[in-house]
Amino acid sequence: MSATALGMIIFAYLCGSISSAILVCKAAGLPDPRENGSGNPGATNVLRNGGRLAAAAVLIFDVLKGMIPVWLAYTLEMSPFYLGLTAIAACLGHIYPVFFRFRGGKGVATAFGAIAPIGWDLTGLMVGTWLLTVLLSGYSSLGAIVSALIAPFYVWWFKPQFTFPVAMLSCLILVRHHDNIQRLWRGKEGKIWRKKGAKSAQNSERPASASPPHDDEPQTPR
């Protein structure tokens, strides 16, 4: 491994370790996403707790965390294998951030950003797949899972030389969503949107000492 490749991998991990959800919520005076809602510091949980504007900011920053390192590696003409390692490093930084006690998010938005430098046509297909799945099912996690499963086939069709690194990235996303897959199978996964009345009742009735639910876990009034 060259010094350039090693440096890019380390840089990607450090970029991924910047938790935009925590920083945006702190700057906006919103609750810490690690201690509220699902407990997951990601755009979906920020959407539930803080609204669309804060969630949009988190989403953009998370995408850039994956896009910038991989784009730099791409311009340096690194091999597809090391491009894949750079993308995985960015996602690992998001999932296990060194700056925030290794407690991070799911890595979906960062993975989208890491794939973007391969081609905007591929990125459009990926975003379209996620959006269509969420609109039809209401499950953000299902959108991520379906997108991760189909991503290697999209890449194989457009730029087959990147199939292996994207497949590695997809495996990481699927492993990270193993709890969501189990809840989807049992029919206990929560949807991305909830009625405001149900949310207010759930928040008012939950004991202060109660631990936050898992990401995308159904949150109904007791």
From Swiss-Prot:
One of its GO terms (molecular function) is acyl-phosphate glycerol-3-phosphate acyltransferase activity. The chain crosses the membrane at residues 5-25, 53-73, 80-100, 112-132, 138-158. Residues 213-222 have a biased composition (Basic and acidic residues). Catalyzes the transfer of an acyl group from acyl-phosphate (acyl-PO(4)) to glycerol-3-phosphate (G3P) to form lysophosphatidic acid (LPA). This enzyme utilizes acyl-phosphate as fatty acyl donor, but not acyl-CoA or acyl-ACP. GO terms for cellular component: plasma membrane. Signal peptide: none annotated. The keyword Transmembrane applies. Residues 192-222 are annotated as: Disordered. It comes from Edwardsiella ictaluri (strain 93-146). It catalyses: an acyl phosphate + sn-glycerol 3-phosphate = a 1-acyl-sn-glycero-3-phosphate + phosphate. Keywords: Cell inner membrane, Cell membrane, Lipid biosynthesis, Lipid metabolism, Membrane, Phospholipid biosynthesis, Phospholipid metabolism, Transferase, Transmembrane, Transmembrane helix. Its EC number is 2.3.1.275. The keyword Cell division does not apply. Probably interacts with PlsX. InterPro entries: G3P_acylTferase_PlsY. Pathway: Lipid metabolism; phospholipid metabolism. NCBIfam families: glycerol-3-phosphate 1-O-acyltransferase PlsY. It holds the Pfam family G3P_acyltransf. It is a multi-pass membrane protein. It is found in: Cell inner membrane. This is Glycerol-3-phosphate acyltransferase. GO terms for biological process: phospholipid biosynthetic process.
